[in-house]
Structure formats: structure tokens, C-alpha cells
């Protein structure tokens, strides 16, 4: 069985094909598998189309490939030129591989290198072309291979013929092959009488001539060719686009030919010898004739000293170049600037210089004296100084205080201190030093240091004296203490000078309260006279029981008003209580249970003002949606001393934009501040007395109701409405029977200030919790469920207590700010006097209870205060 081979060439190329058939070497005997496969694809459906080549059996070797189709065979060691994927390649040593590869180019034939991609047919290289390349290659292999740099040095030094270059020889092979096939195509096109078309083949195969080349020049270098280093089909020639310039539009551009590494122009007029002489020229260089658009050369010059060089070149601040602006500016001639423009530029530069001087950190600017100038003033037209020549100094006397010490200029005064230290505590000397001061010192600004208000100045001086005195242990020194929101309970037992009156001037001597005469000064009671009782039970008392004299006194007396910064356009003040009782005969009696049920409110100066509405506190822990509802209190037969530290009621803070103190800081102050243990806020009103020690009001029905509601809300935690979860109170009473296991929070009793106080535990130890909750845990069926419930309850109680602490701190701060902003007004005929501009300090706190724990009745001081009002007016 014989395989079809490449068709026989036509008579036109007989000079090439016949000689090639007769003188072919041994490598030609073995067909290229690529060629056989291509021929099989073209003639698989044709019978007896291809004529097999005649081969002599004398030169056949036993291991040479036969015409039969064999899929696998052992290759001949001498046959290395055949490169096919069907061959079995055995591993060999490195030296043997290099030796075989070096001889492969010598044994390589002219087949299997070129292919027409349009017709998918292999194209043979003409023998003359291949023979020339083969001979030159032998000569190169016989001599030592030199590098390109050695070749360049040899050509420059001597006139030796350079070695054969592969790139140019490959280009010559490609160009000669394409020219040969173009010539044969032209000759066949002239001979139209001879039919070279096979009558049998439906594929239009011609056996008398090589396949015609397509006008698209689809000749490619096969991937299997050893000349192809990329192992991909590489086009042999690339056609460049035509010239774009009108001068060269009729000129044809020379194409680029593959040279083994890239594409370069092939010199068509050069012969092989001339080609070899021009081997060392760079292969990828292009001549100037290939430029379709010639370079535009413009001689443009501009001054680099020009300040607006960037503007002239069209370069903006972001380094963007505007070529249109650049071209317009460079083409237009630069106009000579006029004289006026130069003058304007000089003025601008002078201004810039002055601004630079002013921007320096130096404090002194030396202005030269025109009389002592070394250079005479210019008398030209520009910048004449005739006006300054006639200048005479003014006759106004200079101020004697302006005495510049030449030695102190440009030097740092190390002895300068600000403010001047005053070691003397005497007020007169301090004022004297302030008024006199360093009059001769130029560094001080001369301003009027007299105070706007004498009372304000005296108050400020008193605070300075208190601050300076080292032996003064007064706890009310006005220092800023972040941790103290209210005064300690120790401040209550101290005696102070003022109650609700502004501080007296420093010129008036302050008389101690213990040794003061009641005729000359007001007797300071232990309870503030501004605190009156307001009880709903007063409606039952007949109007005759109320003293008209006392009522007039209440209208005349100036009571501090509550100043609140509203969030909305609503004035937040309290209505005056209509029922005010004064019983002078009960001076030495204790509080009645009806009066003790209600907190004491500060009466407002206005007669009829809308009431204060509750608001949502800006707390970081809780924001209550509904206001706390408290039922009408009922009397409780119990002394307030037994209830101190036991009642924890919620307070509705009012609309004051004060920052709420954090609960962590509040809880951390419990050890240092005694008032955190003993102060309790009222549930009826958010306004407490001026002593920051709120009153205590408890009634039995409220306690029982709150206690029941609290237990229900805690048991149904997370299931009830918001009112049950948010509205809470912790009433604790000794007389109220309650078991420890009924309470949902853990408390311990501690002795503080000689009293047993029950303290709520937020985070307790495990052993204490086990002891306190032994009874409650017995009711729980599952231990894990009890643990989860207890954790939830602790978390809820912690949030509740922290919210109460926030509210307490907010209320205390609000009261302090209210007391600071109070304005006391006293008028004889009920006429309101103008308020003073000076800031009035808050009234000083007073104790609620005496040393024995009995509450103080404010009514027992009413008569004495009422009698001392005229004397107080005389003092003012």
C-alpha cells in the first residue's frame, strides 16, 4: 500500500522540479508526515490521483521508513531532520543531542518549511535558493561561531568578509521563494491554451505547476520548521498601509519580511554578497522614507527668565498642557511692555515686599529716617520725594510713658512675668497694685481695671483670699470638682453668713452668726425660710385658720424663681402653691404626718404660670416613654428618720439641657460622698430644697401598691407593657413585713453614720448570692432555668438602679444650676425691683434634722423671720 505524496510540478517549473527529483539526497527519501497528512486530507476521496515517486532500492537502508503507513517505528539515528509528533523520541545524553542538533541544519531539506494557509498546502523552497543557504551554513559550521560584537569589531578593524547571518539569509530565502512562485504564476497566466487542470479531480488540483499564491500573500512559516522559533504559524511578509501624506500617496510602501526574530525591510536591489556586507545593520531599523507624515520643525524661542513661563507654554497648576494656548502664545510675537505697565509692576513688587516684611515673626519693623538717609532722594520724574524733602516733624509732644529701652530691643526678657505676683493678701494693696501696676512698662495695655459691679468684685476677691489662705479648711472652697455633683453631708452642719441675700461688699465687715445681734442682722435659722409646705389636706382647713398676715408676707417676700432653659417654646415654671400654712404656735412640735407626706416646693415669683411638663432624659442607659405615675399620698405613722436610706423613688427630671452624669462615676463616688447614702429624692416633685438634701415622703398605700406592681413587673419581665417595665420603685420599710425570699434583688445591711442602712447589691460574690437565694432556688425546678432567670433579673435591676442614679444626678445638677441662677427680690410695697446684673450665688444648705434625728419644723421660724424682715431691709 502506497501513500499519496505531494503533486508533481508542472512543465513551467521543470528546471526546478526535475533536477530536484534527480539529485535529491537521502533526507528526501523519507516523506514528511506533515506533508503526507495534508495530502491525505486533500485526496481521501479520490482513487489513483497521486503518482508515487520512483525511488532506487540500492540506496535503501534496512531501518529506513517504507511507503507503508506505520504508526510507530524506531527512528533512524541519521534521520534527525524529520520532526513529527508521531515519532517516538528516546532520551539521549546532552552532548549527543547538541551534536545531532548542530548537524540537523546540514541535513535539513527544503521541504516542510512554508505553507499556504489559504489552500492548506505545503510549499517547497526552490533548490537553488536552498543550496546557497545550505553551502553557506556548512561554511559557518566549520569555523568558530563568533558573536555579533566580535563580528562588528572584525569588520571595523579589517576588511574580512563577515560570517553568514541567519536573519538576512532567511529573508533572502523567503524573498526568493516568493519571487519564484510569482514568476511562475505570471508565466502560467500568459499560456492560456494549455490546460493544466486535472479532469478527474473535483478539487481543481493542478499537477503541472505549483499551487497559485493568493493575492493576500498567505504564505506562513510552519510551526514544525526548525527555522521557526515561536512554534506558531508566522506570516512571511507583512504589508504596510499606504502613505497618508499627499506627497507620497502614489508611492508604494515596501513590505516587511520575517527575519527569524522579527520583521524588517529587505533590500531588494542587493545581491547575496551585498546582503552579506549589510548583515550587521540593525534589522528592525526603519528608513526615513517610510515616514508617512514628515516631522514638523519650528524654531521657537522664548525667555526662561519670564515669570509667566508656564502661562506662556499653556501649563496649568496641575501640569496639564494646553497645546492650543501654547501654539497661540509662541506664534504671536511678544509685545514690548509699555512704561505704565512697568510702573504698575514695580508698585506691585513693592507691595509684595512690604507684605513679606509684615509676615515675618519679628515684632519690630525698622522704618528709615528720611533725614539720615545715606543716598540722596531721586529727583527724577518717577518716584520723586519733593514732598518728603519739605517734611517737618510734628510739634506734638511725645508721650513720656513711651520710653523705649535700646538695650531691650531684639532680646528676650527673662525676668518678665505675667501676671505680677502679689504676696500681700490685703485687698487695698491688691487694688493699689492693680491701679498703679507697671505704668512705665510698655508691654502692658493701659485699660480701666475698675470693676463694673462692686459686689461682683468683692465676691471675687473673697474667693481669691479663700484660695490663698493655707490654714483654711473650709470645705466650700470654690474649686471645680468633677466627681462632686452635690455638697457633702458635712457641709450641712456648718454655719454660713448668707442665706438668700447676695454677698455683701468687702468694705462691710462680716459678723459671725453666733455673736450677731438680732437687731442688726438676721438670725440664721437651721432651716431655710424659703421652704414652705404644700399639702392637699389644706383644703379641709377653714380659711379663718390661715393667717392673712402670713399670706401678705408670702406675697411680699422675694422667693427665688426656677430658671429653666426650655427645649421648646414653653416657659417651664411652677405654679405657686395656693395652700400655704403657717402655725406659729407649733414652734417646738414635730412634723405632723399629713405635712410630712409631701415634699417642700420652692415657690415661684410669678402668680400664674403653666406647670412643668416632664421630658425624656438624655440618659445613656434608659429613656422612659411614659412619665412616672404616683398615686395621691396618704399619711403614714412613721418618723422620717426610719425611712432615710430606705426609699428609692423615681424622679421626673425636667427639660434642662444638661449633660447627664454617667452611672459609673456616680457609683464610684459612693465611698467618698456621704450624701450618696443618706440623700433620698421625693416622688411627688422633681424640685427639692436648697440644701440638696431632699425631703422624705412616704405613705402606706403607695408603698404597698408600688411593692405589688414591682413584683408583677419583675416576674413578667419582657412580657408586660412598657409602663410595667419602666415604672418602678424600691420601697423598703422596717415596719412593713416582707420576707427576704420575696424580694427579687439582693440587699445587705450596713452601719453608716450610726444607722443601719440597707444597701442594694449590683454585683455580689457567688457565696453571698447562694446564701441569700437559698429559699428562692428551692422553688425552681431546673437549675439552669433558675440561673438564667436570676441573670436576667440582675441585669434588669442593674439597669433600673443605673437609671435611677442618672436621674438623681440629673436632678441634683438641675437644682444646683437653679440655685445659682436665683435672683432674690425684696420690696416693701410689693413692687419688684430691677434685678442685679451680677451673678448671685446659691443659698447655703441647712440640715433637715437635728443631732437626735428629729425633723425641724420650718413654721417655728416663721414668726422670727417675719419680725426680722424690717431689720433686714434696713441693712440693705
UniProtKB/Swiss-Prot annotation:
Q: Where in the cell is it found?
A: Bud neck
| Protein's UniProt name | Factor interacting with REF2
Query: What cellular component GO annotations does this protein have?
Result: cellular bud neck
What's any GO biological process attached to this entry? mRNA processing
Q: What is the effect of changing residue 614 to R?
A: In strain: ATCC 200060 / W303
Compositionally biased region (Polar residues): 628-641, 685-700, 723-738, 856-866
Per UniProt, subunit arrangement is: Interacts with PAP1, REF2 and PBP1.
Give residue numbers for the modification (Phosphoserine).
81, 172, 225
Q: How is it modified after translation?
A: Phosphorylated by CDC28.
Give the compositionally biased regions (Low complexity): 272-286, 659-684
Decide whether keyword Phosphoprotein is in the record: yes
Leader sequence residues: none
Keyword list (alphabetical) reads: mRNA processing, Phosphoprotein
Chain positions covered by the region annotation Disordered: 49-85, 135-172, 241-293, 419-446, 466-551, 628-700, 712-742, 826-845, 852-876
Its biological purpose is as follows:
Involved in 3' mRNA processing. Positively regulates poly(A) synthesis.
> Where in the sequence does UniProt note compositional bias of the Basic residues kind?
135-147, 476-485
Amino acid at each position: 500500500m502506497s501513500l499519496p505524496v505531494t503533486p508533481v510540478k508542472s512543465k513551467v517549473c521543470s528546471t526546478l522540479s526535475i533536477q530536484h527529483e534527480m539529485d535529491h539526497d537521502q533526507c528526501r527519501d523519507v516523506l514528511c508526515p506533515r506533508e503526507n497528512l495534508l495530502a491525505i486530507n486533500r485526496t481521501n476521496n479520490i482513487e489513483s490521483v497521486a503518482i508515487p515517486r520512483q525511488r532506487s532500492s540500492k540506496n535503501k537502508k534496512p531501518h529506513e521508513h517504507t511507503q507503508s503507513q506505520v504508526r510507530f517505528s524506531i527512528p533512524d539515528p541519521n534521520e534527525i531532520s524529520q520532526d513529527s509528533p508521531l515519532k517516538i523520541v528516546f532520551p539521549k545524553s546532552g552532548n549527543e543531542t547538541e551534536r545531532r542538533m548542530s548537524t540537523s541544519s546540514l541535513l535539513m531539506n527544503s521541504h516542510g518549511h512554508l505553507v499556504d494557509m489559504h489552500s492548506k498546502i505545503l510549499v517547497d523552497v526552490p533548490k537553488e535558493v536552498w543550496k546557497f543557504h545550505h553551502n553557506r551554513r556548512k561554511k559557518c559550521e566549520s569555523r568558530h561561531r563568533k558573536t555579533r560584537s566580535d563580528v562588528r569589531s572584525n569588520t571595523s578593524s579589517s576588511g574580512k568578509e563577515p560570517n553568514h547571518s541567519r536573519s538576512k539569509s532567511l529573508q533572502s530565502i523567503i524573498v526568493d521563494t516568493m519571487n519564484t512562485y510569482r514568476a511562475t504564476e505570471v508565466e502560467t497566466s500568459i499560456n492560456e491554451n494549455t490546460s493544466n487542470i486535472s479532469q478527474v479531480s473535483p478539487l481543481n488540483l493542478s499537477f503541472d505547476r505549483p499551487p497559485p499564491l493568493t493575492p493576500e500573500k498567505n504564505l506562513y512559516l510552519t510551526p514544525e520548521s526548525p527555522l521557526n522559533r515561536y512554534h506558531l504559524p508566522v506570516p512571511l511578509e507583512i504589508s504596510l498601509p499606504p502613505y497618508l501624506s499627499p506627497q507620497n500617496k502614489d508611492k508604494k510602501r515596501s513590505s516587511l519580511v520575517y527575519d527569524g526574530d522579527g520583521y524588517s525591510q529587505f533590500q531588494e536591489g542587493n545581491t547575496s554578497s551585498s546582503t552579506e556586507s549589510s548583515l550587521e545593520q540593525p534589522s528592525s531599523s526603519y528608513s526615513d522614507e517610510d515616514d508617512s507624515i514628515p516631522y514638523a520643525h519650528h524654531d521657537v524661542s522664548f525667555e526662561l527668565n519670564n515669570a509667566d513661563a508656564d502661562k506662556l507654554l499653556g501649563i496649568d497648576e496641575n501640569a496639564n498642557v494646553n497645546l492650543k494656548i501654547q501654539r497661540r502664545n509662541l506664534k504671536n510675537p511678544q509685545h514690548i511692555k509699555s512704561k505704565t505697565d512697568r510702573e504698575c509692576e514695580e508698585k506691585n513688587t513693592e507691595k509684595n515686599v512690604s507684605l513679606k516684611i509684615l509676615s515675618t515673626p519679628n515684632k519690630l519693623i525698622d522704618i528709615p529716617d528720611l533725614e539720615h538717609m545715606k543716598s540722596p532722594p531721586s529727583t527724577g520724574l518717577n518716584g520723586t520725594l519733593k514732598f518728603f524733602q519739605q517734611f517737618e516733624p510734628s510739634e506734638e509732644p511725645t508721650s513720656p510713658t513711651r520710653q523705649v529701652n535700646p538695650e531691650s530691643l531684639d532680646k528676650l526678657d527673662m525676668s518678665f512675668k505675667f501676671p505680677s505676683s502679689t504676696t500681700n493678701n490685703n485687698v487695698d494693696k491688691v487694688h493699689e497694685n492693680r491701679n498703679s501696676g507697671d505704668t512705665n512698662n510698655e508691654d502692658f495695655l493701659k485699660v480701666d481695671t475698675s470693676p463694673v459691679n462692686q459686689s461682683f468684685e468683692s465676691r471675687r476677691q473673697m474667693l481669691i483670699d479663700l484660695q490663698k489662705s493655707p490654714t483654711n479648711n473650709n470645705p466650700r472652697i470654690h474649686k471645680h470638682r468633677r466627681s462632686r455633683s452635690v455638697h457633702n453631708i458635712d457641709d450641712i452642719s456648718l454655719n454660713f453668713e448668707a442665706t438668700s441675700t447676695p454677698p455683701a461688699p468687702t468694705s462691710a465687715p462680716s459678723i459671725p452668726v453666733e455673736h450677731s445681734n438680732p437687731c442688726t442682722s438676721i438670725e440664721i435659722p437651721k432651716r431655710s425660710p424659703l421652704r414652705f409646705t404644700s399639702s392637699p389636706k389644706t383644703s379641709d382647713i377653714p380659711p379663718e385658720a390661715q393667717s392673712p398676715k402670713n399670706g401678705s408676707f408670702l406675697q411680699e417676700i422675694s422667693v427665688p424663681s426656677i430658671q429653666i432653659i426650655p427645649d421648646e417654646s414653653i416657659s417651664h415654671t411652677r405654679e405657686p402653691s395656693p395652700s400655704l400654712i403657717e402655725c406659729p404656735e407649733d414652734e417646738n412640735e414635730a412634723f405632723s404626718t399629713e405635712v410630712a407626706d409631701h415634699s417642700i416646693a420652692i415657690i415661684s415669683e410669678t402668680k400664674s404660670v403653666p406647670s412643668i411638663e416632664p421630658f425624656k432624659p438624655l440618659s445613656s442607659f434608659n429613656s422612659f416613654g411614659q412619665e412616672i405615675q404616683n398615686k395621691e399620698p396618704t399619711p403614714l405613722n412613721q418618723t422620717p428618720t426610719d425611712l432615710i436610706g430606705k426609699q428609692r423613688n423615681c424622679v421626673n427630671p425636667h427639660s434642662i439641657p444638661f449633660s447627664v452624669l454617667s452611672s459609673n462615676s456616680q457609683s464610684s463616688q459612693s465611698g467618698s460622698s456621704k450624701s450618696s447614702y443618706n440623700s433620698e429624692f421625693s416622688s411627688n416633685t422633681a424640685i427639692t430644697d436648697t440644701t440638696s438634701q431632699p425631703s422624705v415622703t412616704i405613705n402606706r398605700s403607695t408603698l404597698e401598691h408600688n411593692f405589688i406592681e414591682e413584683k408583677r413587673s419583675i416576674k413578667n419581665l419582657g412580657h408586660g407593657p412598657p409602663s410595667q417595665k419602666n415604672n418602678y420603685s424600691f420601697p423598703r420599710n422596717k415596719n412593713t413585713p416582707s420576707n427576704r425570699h420575696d424580694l427579687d434583688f439582693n440587699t445587705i445591711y450596713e452601719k453608716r453614720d450610726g444607722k443601719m442602712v440597707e444597701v442594694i447589691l449590683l454585683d455580689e460574690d457567688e457565696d453571698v448570692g447562694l446564701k441569700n437565694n437559698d429559699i428562692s432556688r428551692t422553688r425552681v425546678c431546673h437549675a439552669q432555668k433558675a440561673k438564667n432567670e436570676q441573670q436576667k433579673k440582675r441585669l434588669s435591676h442593674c439597669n433600673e438602679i443605673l437609671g435611677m442614679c442618672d436621674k438623681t444626678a440629673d436632678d441634683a445638677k438641675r437644682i444646683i444650676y437653679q440655685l445659682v441662677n436665683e435672683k432674690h427680690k425684696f420690696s416693701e410695697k410689693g413692687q419688684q425691683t430691677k434685678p442685679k446684673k451680677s451673678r448671685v450665688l446659691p443659698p447655703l444648705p441647712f440640715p433637715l434634722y437635728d443631732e437626735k434625728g428629729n425633723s425641724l419644723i420650718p413654721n417655728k421660724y416663721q414668726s422670727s423671720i417675719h419680725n426680722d424682715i424690717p431689720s433686714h431691709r434696713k441693712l440693705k
